[in-house]
Amino acid sequence: MKVFEAKTLLTEAEKRAQEYKDLKSKMVKLKKAFKAVADLDDSEFSGKGANNIKSFYEDQAGIADQWIDLIEMKISFLTSIPGFLEDANLSDAYIEETFLAHELANAYTKSKSIMSEQKKAMKDILNDINDILPLDLFSTETFKNELSSAEKKRKEAIEKMDEVDQNLTSEYGLSEANEQMIQADYQALMNATAKGKSASPIHYNAKAYRDSEIHKMTEDVKKQSTDYISFKDQQAEQRRIAKEQEELANRPWYEKSWDAVCNFTGEVSGYYDYKRAADGVDPVTGEKLTAGQRVAAGAMAAAGYIPIVGWAGKLAKGGKAVYSTSKALYRADKALDVYKTPKTFHALQNSSKGLYGLASANGFSEAITGRDMFGNKVSKERQEQSLSGAMAMLVPFGARGINKKLNAKSSSRVSEASTNTSKKPKVPKTYKRPTYFRKGVRDKVWENAKDSTGSVKDPLTKQVMKKDEPWDMGHKPGYEFRKHQQSAMERNISRKQFLDEHNNPDHYQPELPSSNRSHKGEDMTDDYFGD
């Protein structure tokens, strides 16, 4: 028999999370101690035995790092429990499964039976006096509706309790699997210290340990931990944004002006409109926005467009925000399931056309006059992008094809067209941009970018990236293509030499598409740091 007691669960989860935080602090100190021994200078500690001991503690530090990742997984899991309960409306619930599954179920059946018997008895009585005083039999419709509503709540309570139990159990199971892998890796480390019947760090065989099958799997464990923690961070952010939307959903859109735009969210590329409205700075270009652009961003967000999932009023049914433990991956549409709350979008759905009208109007204003709806001057780049943006906002409301009729181009093509109008020296075919990189170049760039923890971070946003998700081959500052092209022409090198330099992994770094295409991290000088 299951007994669900939210208060006890939340209290214990908070307590255990704090214990793990304390443990993490101690493990970090232990890792530093291991590293201190491993990094001892030869003048302080040398010899074959010394090298074995230093290698031993170097690998011990690696295992300590795995424990730290596991602890962070545990903390992420425990601190997400309040969100799980809130999603299921069980934050203050106390439920005994046997009461719901048996007592209430029996009461439902018995109540229906009693009412049926009473109605039959009353019908017989009324039939007996019908010739004297005709009377209508009372309606049981209200009773049936109330009983049906109670039965629905009973079933939903059981489903929610089972769902929360399943979600928490499956996610916790993921960390248990990682824990077993770390323990096995530690055992492999200990086995590598054995020599005959004795075991000591002085006998440590680093090659045997590092070549062991179990140790080779630690990268997968590391990735699984990183992916899970990243998922929980995103989940927490989405829940926070959903709360803000629910608070604003009951207000008419025209009241959501300057003080409210900071709380809207949503855009095809993520929640960039939320960031634009809240911070007043475009997260892609770094450009400071005018008041009109901030209001338009708020309107765009408030209309309810949710990344990946789609329009608020047309969200796909089914699925849960459950992390898949089988492949250590999660589906984006499931992770965004938290947005599927009727309260959040009820008002927004009804007002979305007006909101997009507001955002679109600001776009036309910028494109035609070079100023936003409040009269503030906008940059030339923003003006070029505004027309296509305004057109795109009208598409959901019957304006499909309008871009073609009015010859409106996409923002990238508008920018490209305006750039092409200016006269530029013709680039010889020898130095034209290649359409692809040689085999293995992208993999090498990714490997070169890994930090000491094995993570790859976007240089602009510092966000941890995933190799199996979209990323760009961004030029390192000083190695931009325009500089390389100019340098190649000045040196009059061959096409082969040009391609060899173009495919040099040392000239590139992994970047998020939004960071790479913003050109924000480029070196604006004409100096080329290559060959």
From Swiss-Prot:
Residues 2-39, 139-171 form a coiled coil. The keyword Magnesium does not apply. In the N-terminal section; belongs to the LXG family. The lineage of its organism: Bacteria, Bacillati, Bacillota, Bacilli, Bacillales. Induction: Expressed on rich and minimal solid media likely in early stationary phase; dependent on DegSU. Not expressed in liquid LB, but only under conditions that promote biofilm formation. Probably interacts with cognate immunity protein YqcF but not with non-cognate immunity proteins. The interaction inhibits the toxic activity of YqcF. Disruption phenotype: Deletion of the yqcF-yqcG operon has no visible growth phenotype, however it is out-competed by wild-type cells. Residues 1-235 form the LXG domain. PANTHER family: RIBONUCLEASE YQCG-RELATED, TYPE VII SECRETION SYSTEM PROTEIN ESSD. One of its GO terms (molecular function) is nuclease activity. Keywords: Coiled coil, Hydrolase, Nuclease, Secreted, Toxin. It comes from Bacillus subtilis (strain 168). InterPro entries: Bact_secretion_toxin, LXG_dom, PT-TG_dom, YqcG_C. This is Toxin YqcG. Signal peptide: none annotated. Toxic component of one of 6 LXG toxin-immunity modules in this strain. They promote kin selection, mediate competition in biofilms, and drive spatial segregation of different strains, indicating that LXG toxins may help avoid warfare between strains in biofilms. Mediates intercellular competition during biofilm formation; disruption of the operon disadvantages the bacteria, but overexpression of the cognate immunity protein restores growth in competition with wild-type. It is found in: Secreted. Residues 408-422 have a biased composition (Polar residues). Residues 469-483, 497-509 have a biased composition (Basic and acidic residues). One of its GO terms (cellular component) is extracellular region. Residues 408-430, 469-531 are annotated as: Disordered. It comes from the Bacteria. The keyword Iron does not apply.
